[in-house]
């Protein structure tokens, strides 16, 4: 498969799986790519990071929107959830059977590997967008401080 066909296929999948809207549970705007239309219908932390990296090559504005949406789910203590259920009503059967660690809110209380800074850095290097960087730094700082405080109690890194 040549590069052009590969890019075309990737673009088609990412556009087909793109979800945009306003969450009825918190009024926030969202724009992200679902990993799978059936199996994984919500925003998943590390999938969004990888989607954003891929989107750098296809649609840089959507790459930024993907990370902004994920960062907008950060809690006041800095935690960014593993899954954010932006469209709660769309998959009630998924929510009733497949979520471990689901809180009363519309996100999971578990986490995935903390690769968000890498994705944000890749976007910034590709775009040079200072406003995006200025928005991301405090969110990322709070998130990594949360990890240090909550997930590393013995302080061994």
Regions found by a protein language model. Give the residues of each.
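Low-complexity, Ser/Thr/Pro/Gly-enriched N-terminal "stalk/linker" regions
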Residues: 1-43, 64-65, 69, 78-83
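Bulky hydrophobic/aromatic packing residues
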Residues: 25, 36-40, 44-46, 115-118, ...
């Amino acid at each position: 498969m040549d590069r052009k066909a590969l890019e075309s296929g990737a673009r088609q999948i990412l556009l087909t799986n793109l979800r945009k809207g306003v969450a009825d549970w918190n009024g926030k705007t969202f724009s992200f790519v679902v990993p799978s239309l059936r199996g994984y219908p919500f925003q998943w932390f590390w999938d969004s990071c990888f989607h954003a990296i891929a989107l750098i090559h296809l649609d840089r504005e959507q790459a930024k929107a993907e990370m902004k949406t994920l960062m907008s789910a950060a809690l006041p203590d800095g935690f960014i959830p593993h899954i954010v259920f932006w469209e709660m009503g769309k998959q009630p059967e998924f929510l009733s059977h497949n979520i471990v660690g689901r809180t009363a809110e519309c996100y999971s209380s578990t986490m995935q590997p903390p690769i968000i800074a890498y994705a944000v850095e890749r976007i910034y290097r590709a775009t040079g967008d200072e406003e995006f960087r200025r928005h991301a730094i405090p969110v990322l700082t709070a998130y990594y401080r949360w990890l240090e405080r909550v997930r590393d109690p013995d302080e061994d890194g």
